[in-house]
Swiss-Prot record:
Motif mapping: 'KMSKS' region: 260-264
Any Pfam family: tRNA-synt_1c
Chain ranges for the short sequence motif 'HIGH' region as given in the UniProt record: 12-22
Keywords: Aminoacyl-tRNA synthetase, ATP-binding, Cytoplasm, Ligase, Nucleotide-binding, Protein biosynthesis
Biological process according to GO: glutamyl-tRNA aminoacylation
Protein name, as recorded: Glutamate--tRNA ligase
Binding site for ATP: 263
Organism encoding this protein: Porphyromonas gingivalis (strain ATCC BAA-308 / W83)
Catalytic activity: tRNA(Glu) + L-glutamate + ATP = L-glutamyl-tRNA(Glu) + AMP + diphosphate
Catalytic activity, EC: 6.1.1.17
Amino acid sequence: MINRRIRVRFAPSPTGPLHIGGVRTALYNYLFARQHGGDMILRIEDTDSNRFVPGAEAYIIEALEWLGIKFDEGVGYGGRFGPYRQSERRDIYRTYVRQLLDSGRAYIAFDTPEELEARRAEVPNFQYDATTRGQMRNSLTLPAEEVERLVAEGTQYVVRFLVEPNLDVEVNDLIRGRVVINSSILDDKVLYKSADDLPTYHLANIVDDHLMEVSHVIRGEEWLPSAPLHVLLYRAFGWEDTMPRFAHLALLLKPEGNGKLSKRDGDRLGFPVFPLEWKDPQTGDISKGYRESGYLPEAVVNFLALLGWNPGNDQDVMSMDELIRLFDIEKCSKAGAKFDYEKGRWFNHQYIQRKDNAELAELFRPILRENGVVATDEKTAHVISLVKERVNFIGELWEQAGFFFIAPLSYDEKTVKKRWKEDTAKQLGELAELLDSHRSFAAEATEPTVKNWIETNGYHLGNIMNATRLALVGESKGPHIFDIMEVLGREETVGRIRRAIEVLG
């Protein structure tokens, strides 16, 4: 392995929204690149035109930007190895298809889909390989003149890689160690289709990684069975000395651990599997995302980083900078990681507690607007400081703090029965008079005054406080009652108490 600059790529296909497993792959690439002072490339692998979904590429870019996963070059970023969309690299791929054909490492096949289907029906476990290619319609069995004629006439064909049998192909994986597979189990994979003049994933992947000087390929374990083919392609091109190192990440599993995590699991258990909300352009169906569900991007990043890797200590909460410093690709687990969505909620709660109140106020502002509330930044930040320990998601801020901005229109019946006693109206009337004449409304000023008044009059502290909370909030929730009064101010506090007396009697 020659010593060279670390360069990694995240290469999604625009076939739909980016799955949370793909986000983790992008994150691990990013952590590895940043740790080694290397480059992160965004490449869009859009060679499968049949599966292309409008809007998917823009979604992928927006999702990664939201999560703070940044690229040095690629689609939307530019760079000297472009273009970075595979559909824009046709001329490049044609050159390398021709190189393989000329060197005898690939061949042209004219078998139609119907003919191949017939063979599969005749022969169980049929595959196009060294044992069967001599029986098929291809440039290995047809005269050269006929091959030229068929191509000239526009007959559709594919180019297949000629896999030599009985070779031990070694893949040195950074996570799984040495993996050896005999080439006899591999089929002659299709590398190019004349129908759309585009390569398949395998050829485009190898050519692009080589030309873009990718040093490490970090991807999901679903690509591990393809790794021997990719090694053989590097050999066929004479690029084995500059072949990247591979690291195949274990799958994200269902919370129960039995199988790969899917959208269906999220729907069943009530958690997102996409970073952002996604609207299917064909059906109009909407799938919720982590952003719209009230998750902070830092929490999602921290949560995902620890699904399949840990720093070797008891530390859970880590910033992106800490993750970059501690991440070790070789310590990633070979076994799949159960998706613990409750742990994700826990991480979000931790990050909400740590986040600056002014920043949370910015995130809360759209929710205030939806509820017709206009409030100062100072008040909003103050309110958040009082309630954020009670919330797991941004959306829950309104549930916990809405009463600070809109007076209760009704009162919880159970709380009324429990807290509103015969003498409550009289006592709260006196409290309203006391508060209305109080000069300072800071909590540290009102609390001793009110408690002294309660003691002097022989009233029950708990009864007064509970009834006052009901008057101000409409139910029995909320932070310290004197903090609530301070935020509401004298006029609003007294007004709410007097309205409760009027309504509840």
